[in-house]
Amino acid sequence: MPTQPSKELERIPNPKPERDYEIEITTNEFTCVCPRTGQPDFATITIRYVPDQWIVELKSLKLYLWSYRNEGHYHEEVTNTILDDLVRTLEPRRMTVIADFNIRGGLHTVVTARYERTAEGPARLAAD
């Protein structure tokens, strides 16, 4: 298994696909770079989802999140990109990604992006 940052998310079979249950994963080690100032942005990322057939392999998630540390991204962009990548890989029933960024310049930013599969097919809800 790799030990370097990677954009490759891995999935493993859900042991209870017949049941609706929620998985919550939190890390306070997320870092990216502000594309305007070049300064680091630190955030606590919380991922909540109801899986269908797949769950995320945690080490691959750690390396995926780590891959952003030297990349320039706005808060809203990176939160939605994380959601999109996880939804594409896991095909969950529902998922929410919350990025709670540390205060910079006196401003505290929290971005919440949601996805919910509907009877008509996938539907992505707007970021808060």
Curated annotation (Swiss-Prot):
Where located? Cytoplasm
Alphabetized Gene3D superfamilies for the sequence: 3.30.1130.10
What is annotated as the active site? 34, 41
By its UniProt entry, which Pfam families does this protein fall under? QueF
Q: What are the GO BP annotations of this UniProt entry?
A: queuosine biosynthetic process; tRNA modification
Q: Which UniProt keywords apply?
A: Cytoplasm, NADP, Oxidoreductase, Queuosine biosynthesis
The record's EC number reads 1.7.1.13
Under Gene Ontology molecular function, one entry of this record is: preQ1 synthase activity
Keyword NADP set for record: yes
Could you tell me which pathway this protein works in? Answer: tRNA modification; tRNA-queuosine biosynthesis
Which InterPro entries has this protein been placed in?
GTP-CH-I_C/QueF (IPR043133), NADPH_dep_7-cyano-7-deazaG_red (IPR050084), QueF (IPR029500), QueF_type1 (IPR016856)
GO (cellular component) term, any one: cytoplasm
Instruction: Please write the reaction equations for the catalytic activity of this protein.
Output: 7-aminomethyl-7-carbaguanine + 2 NADP(+) = 7-cyano-7-deazaguanine + 2 NADPH + 3 H(+)
- Binding of substrate, residues: 56-58, 75-76
The UniProt family comment states: Belongs to the GTP cyclohydrolase I family. QueF type 1 subfamily.
Job of this protein: Catalyzes the NADPH-dependent reduction of 7-cyano-7-deazaguanine (preQ0) to 7-aminomethyl-7-deazaguanine (preQ1).
Matching entries from HAMAP family are given as: QueF_type1
What is the protein name given in its UniProt record? NADPH-dependent 7-cyano-7-deazaguanine reductase
- Organism of derivation: Thermomicrobium roseum (strain ATCC 27502 / DSM 5159 / P-2)
